[in-house]
Amino acid sequence: VLSYLFKRLEERFDGQPTLLILDEAWVFLDDPAFAGRIREWLKTLRKRNVSVIFATQSLADIQRSTIAPAIIESCPSRIFLPNPQAVEPQLREIYEGFGLNARQIQLIARAEPKREYYYQSRLGNRVFELGLGPVTLAFAGASSPQHQKTMNAFTGVIDPADFALVWLRHA
């Protein structure tokens, strides 16, 4: 089944700009077949105009992976979420493994949750905010189970063309 899935995905990598988003990346990293293919993709997909995005709530998931060196080397641009525990010895060591120094780890530890993020790349590093306004947040921030339940309740009841207006009134 995985071989078929990999084949179907690779058929879609046709040179058009593509994002391969691996959310909850630990699931993929824990599976030897997936991990091996991800390692291969990290080395080859750039030539096919594919960018790979790993999303995980725990950097330890990546650090413990058998392909951690390939991920760290092939993904030089990273966004770190605020983590007050980042300065604790065990976690600090993990952050250092991603090339962060004491000052950068301190910035991550002091960043305001759900507002500030730390960007790391070869071109530079900085704390940033998305600066989303209330309208954008009404859509981009609607990710809770209750939000999903409400959206599902709208399905089939309202005209899809009216969804944005109805959602904004609800939010």
Which residue ranges define each predicted feature?
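Conserved P-loop NTPase motor module
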Residues: V1-G15, I79, Q106-A171
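Conserved P-loop NTPase motor cores
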Residues: V1-Q104, P134
